[in-house]
Amino acid sequence: DRDAQTLTDERSDQGDGNFRYEFETSNGIYTQKTGTPGSEGQSNYQGSFRFTLEDGTIAEVTYIADENGFQPSSDLLPVGPPAPPHVQRLLEIAAEQRAQGITFD
């Protein structure tokens, strides 16, 4: 959109791994993100972005990125079916065994 105007463009970087930014345009594009140093040497991010789809639907994604990887969340993302009961039971057994100190290397 050539006529889109920047409504918000705020950035803060403390130089120690902590930062924040926010950006928004008049055509509905928005993003924000904060970052902090992680406990295992990684950077931890938390943020979101949104924009309007061609049909007028607002697409919004929130996310966390840390030592566990990128973890997006959105109503637009597909969700797999739940694990069947026998798989859930196996996961419970594995958790019990880990709690008892049992490992399988």
From Swiss-Prot:
PROSITE patterns: CHIT_BIND_RR_1, CHIT_BIND_RR_2
One term under GO cellular component: chitin-based extracellular matrix
Top-level taxon of the source organism: Eukaryota
InterPro entries: CHIT_BIND_RR_consensus, Cuticle_Struct_Prot, Insect_cuticle
Domain Chitin-binding type R&R: 16-81
Tissue expression as described in the entry: Arthrodial membrane.
Pfam families the UniProt entry points to: Chitin_bind_4
PANTHER family: CUTICLE PROTEIN, CUTICULAR PROTEIN 47EF, ISOFORM C-RELATED
Protein's name in the database: Cuticle protein AMP1A
Species per Swiss-Prot/TrEMBL record: Homarus americanus
